[in-house]
Design a protein with these regions (language model features):
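Lipid interaction determinants
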Residues: 1-50, 54-105
Length: 105
């Protein structure tokens, strides 16, 4: 288990879209810039908000939605999203460059 640090997160997050497997359903998070993010949940709910990198994770504040603190945990062959309680909430199934899901639109 390796929690990814700020420098690594900046490389794999800014300007990309993470496709996250949430138990057989996919969520999409597009990190448009170093401060703006957009999310589409499996049930169709969309959020737009502000995020900031931390030394060992990031924080996000969704407009009209939740605020959260997250870490990305790397193990060989996988990167998991871990919430503030230490619970794994999803696994990255792929990372796309840009915004192919048009979440920022």
């Amino acid at each position: 288990m390796t929690i990814l640090n700020k420098d690594t997160l900046a490389i794999i997050m800014i300007g990309t879209t993470h496709v996250i497997d949430m138990g057989g359903k996919s969520a999409f998070i597009h990190y448009e810039t170093g401060t703006r993010a957009h999310m589409l949940l499996p049930d169709g709910t969309r959020f737009h908000g502000l995020w900031t990198l931390q030394d060992d994770g990031y924080k996000v504040e969704w407009q009209d939605g939740p605020t959260g603190a997250w870490k990305l945990d790397h193990t060989p062959g996988a990167i998991d999203y871990v919430d503030a309680t230490g619970t794994v909430r999803g696994r990255i199934s792929r990372i796309d460059f840009g915004d192919p899901e048009r979440l920022a639109a």
